[in-house]
Every structure is written in structure tokens, then in C-alpha cells.
Amino acid sequence: MEQKENLEKKNKFILGGVIMDKVCVIGLGSWGSALALTLCKNGYEVHMWTRNEFQANEINTTRENSRFLPGVIFPKEIKISTDLESVIKDSKIIVLAVPSQAVRSVVKQIKHVVKEDQILVDVAKGLERETGLRLSQVVKEELPNNEYVTLSGPSHAEEVSRFMPTTLVAASPNLEIAEIVQDAFMNPQLRVYTNPDIIGVELGGALKNIIAFGAGMCDGLGYGDNAKAALMTRGITEMGRLGVAMGAHVTTFTGLSGIGDLIVTCTSMHSRNRRAGILMGEGKSLEETLKEVDMVVEGIVATEVAYKVGKKLNIDLPITNAIYSVLYENAKPEETVRTLMTRSKKNEMEEVVNNGFVHN
């Protein structure tokens, strides 16, 4: 009842013409744009930043992000600017909606204007290539005194921007801050849960891209539903195995940022990672694949980072290792599948068996 009253209150703000707190979105890609539309619908004063003056002028004039969200109209209340300082000033929440490899450079750029009471919300799903760090760790190195929330889950911008039913998770060790972000984004079409396990939520969002790439590769090779089901199921096991070794709670991988995001990314043509996998399964080179997808494919870097972390921690990651060999060692996709299928026999629940859990 209380949540319903809060949602109705937000709608009254809009209908009454009253604007709530200012928030800003850094980045004008598809996901940042979709979240800006959500925040605007919820009654917030939304400002977006891009360094691309042409893109800013186009959206301010035509009210459409033709590059990333064609056909979706931006309300006039959303302001687009190339002036970073004015966009950030007085914003209660700063949404970082840039590719994972750009997060550090963007945070370095904004940290001289960010105040300590502003909440940072990262929505990228990746790991930093040079350091192997999660994005919350990257941001904390640059802005150690700000509260930080990861917003993740099974969500395609193409659907969120059209206000189709979607669920997300706001993760932070500080649940009070996570609830502020939860309240900011919730509406009748977007349900947001909270989770204190930010490590697990971040890793779920990053690692599922590796498995989605593999699922796409299976499609490109012409394999059926059986192969994809096996890959997804063993993939979530692998995600949990690496996640726990990196400090996550295994149950997080059964939630929205784990199984939830894995399902949507492995099965939808909205998924860049799956599309990239399809193209490489069909025989295209990595260079040809990236040119055709023409957007950031986070799973490519995530594969490299996870492979290196797995080797360092001595974690068994057969699917990740196989995809790494395709991306970075020029292995043939069909050969890697054969290698996976002909490995030595194992128990399905290897960890359970090794811990002595056997029914009499």
C-alpha cells in the first residue's frame, strides 16, 4: 500500500506540473537514454550530458536519439548539454551511463565538480580491462567519499524506453542509499529490488555477457535449443564459482543480475553480446563482427578479465576459457565446442560432492 501511494504521489507531481529533484545522466547511449526517460516520467528534472555537440543538438531539436533509440521521442523536459559542470550541479543522483572502459576517465573528468552528498549510480555491466577491478572499485578510487549504487538486471533499453514491464536491482552495502535509488526509478512499469551484495550484482552483470556471447556462437553454428540450455545452465554455475572466489554471495547469481540477466541476454536479438557471438559462429572475424554490431560489446573485455582472474585464482572456467580462445587465440568456434563436450567426466554438482553431501 505504501509503495502504491509513493508511485501515485510521483504521478501527481508530473500531472500537477511540479518538478522533483534534479538528476543527471552522463552518457547518451541507449541505456542512459532509456533511464533518463524513466526518471523524467517519474517527475524528476533530468539533465543529460554528452561530449558530442552534434548529438546534443540533434536531440534538443528533433527530440529523438536516432543513433541509439530510433523512434523513441524525448519529452521536452529532458535537457541535453555538453556543459558537464552545469549538468552535474545540484543533481541529487548522478547516473554513470558510459561503457565500462570509459568509467574511470569520465569520473576523473567530473570529480572536481561532484559534491560528497551526490549519489553515484553506475549502470554499465563490465570490468576494467587494465586492472580487473569492478566498476564500484574504479569509482571509489577516484571518488572515495561518495555513496555508490549499481543498477543492474534483465533489461534492454529498447523495452525500458517504451515502458514495458521490467525489473532491476539496486545494489549497495548501504541499503538506505540503495532504497533512495530504488524509489527514484520505481514506477508501475519498472520494479526495482535492493541487494547489499554489490560484488555479486556487478559480477553477474559483467560475467553473463561472456555466456551470452557463447550462446550467440551456438546459434551462429546452427546448434539447437539443447546446446543453448546446457551453455546457460553450466554458465551460471561458472559465474557463481568465479563470483564466490571474488567475494560475492552465491545466491545473488540466482537473482535478477544473475539468472535473470543471463536469460534475457542469451535469448534476445537486442543483446549485442549474443549478436556478436552469432556473427563469429557464422565465421566472421572479430574485427568484422565489431564493425557490424557497431556498438560496445562488453563481453569481449569481460572474457579477457575473467580468464586472467580465473588463472590467477586457479578457478575452473571451461566456458570462459573456450570463448577466450576464440576471441584472443583464433580458435575455431566448432573446435572449442568439441573441446568442451569431450572433457573428462564430472559430477554436475562438483562443489556439493566434494564437500561430502551424499544421500544414504
For the regions a protein language model found, what residue spans apply to each?
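NAD(P)+-binding Rossmann beta1-loop-alpha1 motif at the extreme N-terminus of oxidoreductases
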Residues: 16-72, 82
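General beta-strand structural signal in soluble alpha/beta enzymes
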Residues: 122, 147-152, 192-196, 317-319
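NAD(P)-dependent Rossmann-like dehydrogenase/reductase catalytic/cofactor-binding core
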Residues: 215-216, 244-254, 262-360
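Internal alpha-helical scaffold of NAD(P)-dependent oxidoreductase catalytic cores
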Residues: 102, 113, 138, 142-146, ...
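Conserved active-site and cofactor/substrate-binding residues in soluble primary-metabolism enzymes
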Residues: 26, 34, 54, 82, ...
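Rossmann-like NAD(P)(H) cofactor-binding subdomain of soluble oxidoreductases
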Residues: 74, 80, 84-165, 181
